[in-house]
Amino acid sequence: MKLIVGLGNPGIEYQFTPHNLGFLAIDRIAGNLGVEVRNRQCRALTARTVIADQMVLLAKPETFMNLSGLSVRELVAEYEAKPESDLIVIQDELDFPLGTLRIHTRRSSAGHNGIESLIGALGTQDFLRIRIGVAPERKVGDGQSYLLAPLRKAELKVVDGILDTAEDAVKMILKDGPAAAMNRFNRKDESGQ
């Protein structure tokens, strides 16, 4: 079983914020597959489905971003998953421009509290990450305030497109492997840069 975890914060007030792009990506994938992420287990909302002929569990931790590792550690244990081969995490990335996407593995948290929580809880940084850029073109004072504020209408249009790209990245990772997906999606012309 592959675990595909989107990071975000529960609650309607956070639904369309930059920090919730992981949740939005999971919702997009689930919606396109005709499943609902609503089963509660291991402090997360989950749904089982098949992608690229593989059984997967889509998950959205309900522990809030900074404690995401608690839920993910329980999911990894429950499904006897190996983080280095069975876990894909979809996260927002303030260091990348809005609408860009990169796939990485074995990286530090780069200051992302949700990823820091996962690394601490799992005892490894060796897991695959789909990092979706959220840095705005406009200047923002406080990054944390921006991450938790609703996206503007123009930003939502960009997000709509990158969520499709994130879904394509997940499918390619599962079908062709991480290296092939990195080769395709980490190129500048595929990410909007």
Regions found by a protein language model. Give the residues of each.
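Nucleotide and nucleotide-moiety/phosphate-recognizing core
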Residues: K2-R106, E116-I130, E137-D142, A149, ...
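Conserved TIR/SEFIR loop-to-helix hotspot centered on a Trp-containing motif
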Residues: S109
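Active-site YXXXK catalytic motif of short-chain dehydrogenase/reductase
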Residues: H112
